[in-house]
Amino acid sequence: MKNSCFIVLFLLGIIPSAFAQLIGFEEEVPEAFKVSGKGEVKISSLFYKEGESSLEWDFQPGSTLDVQIAPLSLNTRNEKQFGITLWIYNEKPQQDSIRFEFLNKEGEVSYWFSYRLQAAGWRACWISFEYMQGDKKDKKIVAYRLVAPQRKGRIFLDRLIFPEKKMNLRTTPDQQLPTNNGLSNRDLWHWCLVWKWEQQSYDIPLPSKLTSEQKKELKTIEQRLTDFLEVKKAPQGPINAAYKTFEKAAISPSIAGTGFIGTPIVAPDEQDKKKGEMSWNDIETMLSGFAYDAYYNQNETSKKNYFTVFDYAIDQGFAYGSGMGTNHHYGYQVRKIYTTAWLMRDAIYKHPHRDAYLSTLRFWAALQETRQPCSPTRDELLDSWHTLLMAKFISAMMFPDAREQAQALSGLSRWLSSSLRYTPGTIGGIKVDGTTFHHGGFYPGYTTGVLATVGEYIAFTNGTSF
């Protein structure tokens, strides 16, 4: 009996429990994590997404990081809810993947998925067993492993939860995991579709050159937007808030020679405010406050801080091709990122990271959706009009090439016009009797601000071909 108790206690000490808990890799490598083949695993402070350290895996071609777990029994019901969540730091974009494999007691692969390494920085890795590959015949899992690509390299892991027993229903497909959600829920028909829309191409051709009238119209729209967004003097409150938040962010370059360390930035669903973690609203606070100070007061420190924050936000996952695990309702927290980016546009154009900034702004504005007309069954239109129409407009106007501005504005105006049709059933939008629906029902109070935003866009483009 004593021996049995000892074995149970020993196993509990070295094998992660079937009851999920976040592993932050703060002190030592858990006993359950072992490397097979050439390579090494260790605790590192070079990068972290929680606490002050992460798990560094230095791998060689074909090596694996093996993790023993308490047996996990899946079935057709709980495999929809169960999964794995973690964040992975990749230092350099690659054209390969890390393969995750989940094994039965015979060591056979029952479930697997590939995590693409095409981006640098912290990116989320969230996926339920439902959306993994594999024959899924044996649903009793006793271990999982990460399989290295056919090269030498390293990645960093943090914020690991396995098994996650209540996967976020709004898990967002992105460049890293494009098939981690079936997107069958109508509430997902806009926040979580940003990567799907990224696969679309414009059917409006890029003009070889603009006419003098088109150039004049773009200048008119540009001036209207500037007049609308400019204020008489820099608001001191937002500037003070930017510096206060920046101090809490504690951003500094990693001694690895690339990337940063600092306060983690995650989606609100994952944010632990008690630990001081930050989210999109904190990015907005810093970028907008520093932009006001740099633009109106010509404060060089604020200008430097603005780009430091932008670089850090991208490194943390607020970037092109990233869904940050879940991105739902982010539009409410990023509006001023766009309005103040317009004020900073000349400085952005001159910055060596210009393309990264602009691609981030376009991606999170979901401008890519407007490469095609609005789908007749598109739901949640009121959210898009209210929170992201201005972001789309500014992103379209911030193409350095005026020809691309014209193409993007043409696509956006067409998309908006096609979205203002009457929508069927309980699909969000405008109904034949003049009422509006949102979240599948009558939603009059929200509509005032929504239609005001649409009216602003009409005013910006009024009297032009756009």
Model-found features: residue ranges?
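Extracellular carbohydrate-recognition regions
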Residues: 19-38, 173-174
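Extracellular/lumenal ectodomain signal focusing on beta-strand-rich modules
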Residues: 54, 83, 143, 158-159
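Extreme N-terminal leader/anchor segments
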Residues: 170-241, 245
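Extracellular ligand-binding interfaces
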Residues: 57-134, 151-153
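Short carbohydrate-recognition loop motifs
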Residues: 43-64
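Extracellular carbohydrate recognition
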Residues: 136-139, 148-163, 167-173
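Sec-dependent N-terminal signal peptides
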Residues: 4-14
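Aromatic-lined, polymer-binding surfaces characteristic
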Residues: 222-466
